[in-house]
Design a protein with these regions (language model features):
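Solvent-exposed interaction patches of small proteins and small membrane subunits
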Residues: 1-128
């Protein structure tokens, strides 16, 4: 059962990355299309949530502590030697982006979305 949860989260992350890449198509102008923009942002959000779920699952399974936030789950993985601090910081930044996108704290900066697509989708893959 535990491996099934892990495999499911990894599959979700991979599916989201593929969807983002398909919709973006290596063309920043695709971010000007609101439908494509929504699809991309939603899939970044889903990949982030699946990464958080995966981190929480590993933390619970290995009894690494009780994280008080999703960001802290990544910190506990670093402390346990299961994740590099550099990758943890990148994933925690994704959590910040997710919070902006989900809770609409401020409008989403499309330059940040483009940078995530072009430079940071691999961070999700490295985590899986």
């Amino acid at each position: 059962m535990k491996n099934e949860v892990i495999l499911n989260k990894i599959s979700t992350i991979e599916r989201c990355i593929k969807r983002i890449q398909d919709v973006y198509g290596n063309d920043p102008e695709n971010l000007e299309d609101f439908t494509k923009q929504d699809s991309i942002i939603l899939n970044i959000q889903r990949a982030c949530e699946a990464s958080i779920d995966l981190a929480m699952h590993i933390v619970a399974g290995k009894k690494l502590g009780l994280p008080q936030s999703s960001r802290e789950a990544f910190d506990l993985l670093v402390t346990a030697g299961l994740l590099s601090a550099d990758l943890a910081n990148k994933l925690k930044a994704m959590v910040g982006f997710r919070n902006i996108a989900v809770h609409d704290y401020q409008s989403v900066n499309l330059d940040i979305v483009r940078q995530i697509i072009e430079k940071h989708l691999t961070d999700f893959k490295l985590f899986t």
